[in-house]
């Protein structure tokens, strides 16, 4: 056990510590799911897994609440695996190492997994508790949310018995989410041709130290995208420096996180100091430009092993130009929902694989037409760059409903717990609620949770005091669910 088990509420933190001890990155959450299933069987709860691996647990109502409206608490089982450069952490084998840092819980050198591990822990703590009042209760734990919402998409029909769903994936205390953006993946592939490397020198340009973050929730903050900044650097170098050729370009590691690092390996003739000086000058400009948003930004040149082949001159320029004009970030703010992004995209991963440079992009929008406007932009660019773009794994947004029983009850108890009215809002991030609503169109839904910062990055942290507030809210709401 780690030191976080000394925190309150103790049952929730005990469960989160256990969750951290069992590796559960996306696509590797079966061990955690099976652990929970076996625990539920030992407690003699109804427990079942569906065809895609989702877990459903049922607990009878406490005495006197048997005829109250049944509720399902929902969380996802997987976490985003991100580690600091040089950290050998294997997310499929190594436990997360949480620790207390003042008012926050963090992890040592990796993502913490408080998204959605705290929510998951809260559902299990409710199940284990013997002194909480609640109606007939279900807990739904979904698979592989972070890389495509596979569990929510494949959820068994007519499985849930509840009429109210509380999603636990919100990352701001004092807020109730009632709607979210939909999304679609885009794979953008630029074909490249190679030639024998006859250049004298090779070097790697590396960009690192960016903050990264959630590609939906943080897309409006002005944080730099490492892939886009690197493309800008290469475009500037190609204008002013002697001819060079790329042999590799890469950046980012996961589609739904803003890339923190990127690098390009290039070959060139002439004085090495010419490239070094040019990059140093660009670094000065960029550091000044990004001083507030990215205080730890670094850009540097280092020697690299000579590759046997390099991109042709035409392929080098095509890759640089296509990446430099590839849209990224906020496309449009919502006219309907104040201070919320309507449509965006984030270039999440860049790889050189054989004869293509491949970019993985996540498009988000509150409205379907906005989502497909962005995909049309990418299709047009693909034509201009002689590239190929394919779209996959679309998921719907969650359309807000401003009047529901669960919203009224949650507002009431949030005001009591906080001493002020909560903020009811729609977010520019993907929650599973839109997909769950397709399976169960008549179910009422809200989403709540504690304050989490820098999700999807190794700087992720959860605010300790807000976990207690979230727990107080959740338990009060469950005790006040009305009769049918």
From Swiss-Prot:
Q: Which domain of life does the UniProt lineage start with?
A: Bacteria
Q: How is the cofactor bound?
A: Binds 2 Zn(2+) ions per subunit. Can also use Co(2+).
Named from the GO MF annotations, one term is: metal ion binding
Signal peptide boundaries: none
Q: Which SUPFAM superfamilies match?
A: Zn-dependent exopeptidases (SSF53187)
Q: Name the catalysed reactions.
A: Hydrolysis of dipeptides, preferentially hydrophobic dipeptides including prolyl amino acids
Q: What class of enzyme is it?
A: hydrolase
Q: Where is the active site?
A: 78, 145
Protein residues bound to Zn(2+) 2: 76, 115, 169
Instruction: Name the cofactor(s) required for activity, per the record.
Output: Zn(2+); Co(2+)
GO biological processes: proteolysis
Ligand binding (Zn(2+) 1): 115, 146, 456
* Ribosomal protein among keywords: no
Q: Which Enzyme Commission number(s) are on file for it?
A: 3.4.13.18
Q: Name one Pfam family in it.
A: M20_dimer
Task: Pull one GO CC term from this UniProt entry.
Answer: cytosol
The UniProt keyword set, sorted, is: Cobalt, Dipeptidase, Hydrolase, Metal-binding, Metalloprotease, Protease, Zinc
Family, according to the entry, reads as follows: Belongs to the peptidase M20C family.
Purpose: Dipeptidase with broad substrate specificity.
What is the recorded name of this protein? Cytosol non-specific dipeptidase
